[in-house]
């Protein structure tokens, strides 16, 4: 079975860089990122590896909802300027890059989904909770900074919902980190409790007469936001990749 290690480039690099007291100091960044990648390869022993980077194009999510990721701190200029050289350095270690047009998340989700559909296994190196919705047993998530797998069971326990309800949960509760609104007035606890009873977003909205008047009012008024949030949180799994698996195979 092919095992593909898929590294969320900026998720890894920005956190490594954030350990620097001065955000404009990129000295030694190449070495620190290379060391992290070597550690990942040694531990997971994949047959293939790629590091996926966000692109400069406007995300379809931003087009759909202008406030998406609003207020997020921009990448330090020195870090942005250092990325081309970093990518070259990593390619010398056989860690080749895939540059997304916009968000890396959709490319990572597409790659992982294609792999498992062809009897492969994907290990996504990222702390981005959006990948929780990829629930196939052959898609795993690895937190490099805690040196631990992020399991579906852990996410179920933390959120208080089942794996099939992750998208519905975020559509209700929102995601403050990405400025996904959810339904105003419906927080994580309420979202979890509602999904325990009604099982899905569609069932909930088809049964508002069974919900308390105060909560039903919030849900009715926030219906469009729930629909919008549902679209925003969904990962795309059919992005054109324009890449061949063989480009990312590691030498034996």
From Swiss-Prot:
Annotated SUPFAM superfamilies: 5' to 3' exonuclease, C-terminal subdomain, PIN domain-like
Function: Has flap endonuclease activity. During DNA replication, flap endonucleases cleave the 5'-overhanging flap structure that is generated by displacement synthesis when DNA polymerase encounters the 5'-end of a downstream Okazaki fragment.
Pfam families referenced in this protein's UniProt entry, alphabetically: 5_3_exonuc, 5_3_exonuc_N
InterPro entries per record: 5-3_exonucl_a-hlix_arch_N, 5-3_exonuclease, 5-3_exonuclease_C_sf, DNA_polI_H3TH, FEN, HhH2, PIN-like_dom_sf, Xni
Organism superkingdom: Bacteria
Cofactor info, note text: Binds 2 Mg(2+) per subunit. Only one magnesium ion has a direct interaction with the protein, the other interactions are indirect.
EC top class named in words: hydrolase
Binding site for Mg(2+): 105
Documented EC number(s): 3.1.-.-
Annotated positions binding K(+): 172-173, 181, 183, 186
Region (Interaction with DNA): 185-190
This protein's UniProt keywords: DNA-binding, Endonuclease, Hydrolase, Magnesium, Metal-binding, Nuclease, Potassium
Protein name, entry field: Flap endonuclease Xni
Cofactor(s), by name: Mg(2+); K(+)
Family annotation (Gene3D superfamilies): 5' to 3' exonuclease, C-terminal subdomain, 5'-nuclease
BP-aspect Gene Ontology terms: DNA replication, Okazaki fragment processing
Coiled coil: none
């Amino acid at each position: 079975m092919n095992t593909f290690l898929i590294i969320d480039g900026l998720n890894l690099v920005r956190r490594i860089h954030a350990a620097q007291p001065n955000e404009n100091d990129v000295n030694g960044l190449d070495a620190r990122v290379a060391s992290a990648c070597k550690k990942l390869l040694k531990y997971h022993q994949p047959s293939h590896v790629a590091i996926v980077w966000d692109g400069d194009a406007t995300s379809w999510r931003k087009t759909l909802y202008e406030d998406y990721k609003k207020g997020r701190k921009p990448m330090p200029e020195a870090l942005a300027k250092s990325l081309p050289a970093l990518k070259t350095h990593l390619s010398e270690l056989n860690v080749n890059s895939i540059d997304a047009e916009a968000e890396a998340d959709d490319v990572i989700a597409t790659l992982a989904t294609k792999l498992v559909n062809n009897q492969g296994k994907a290990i996504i190196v990222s702390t981005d909770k959006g990948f929780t919705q990829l629930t196939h047993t052959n898609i795993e998530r690895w937190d490099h900074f805690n040196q631990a797998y992020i399991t579906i069971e852990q996410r179920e326990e933390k959120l208080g919902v089942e794996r099939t309800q992750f998208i519905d949960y975020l559509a209700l509760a929102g995601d403050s980190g990405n400025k996904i609104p959810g339904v105003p007035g419906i927080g994580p606890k309420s979202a979890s409790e509602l999904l325990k009873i009604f099982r899905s977003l569609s069932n909930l909205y088809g049964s508002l007469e069974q919900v308390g008047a105060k909560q039903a009012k919030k849900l009715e008024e926030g219906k469009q936001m729930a629909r919008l949030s549902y679209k925003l949180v969904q990962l795309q799994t059919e992005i054109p990749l324009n890449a061949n698996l063989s480009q990312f195979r590691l030498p034996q």
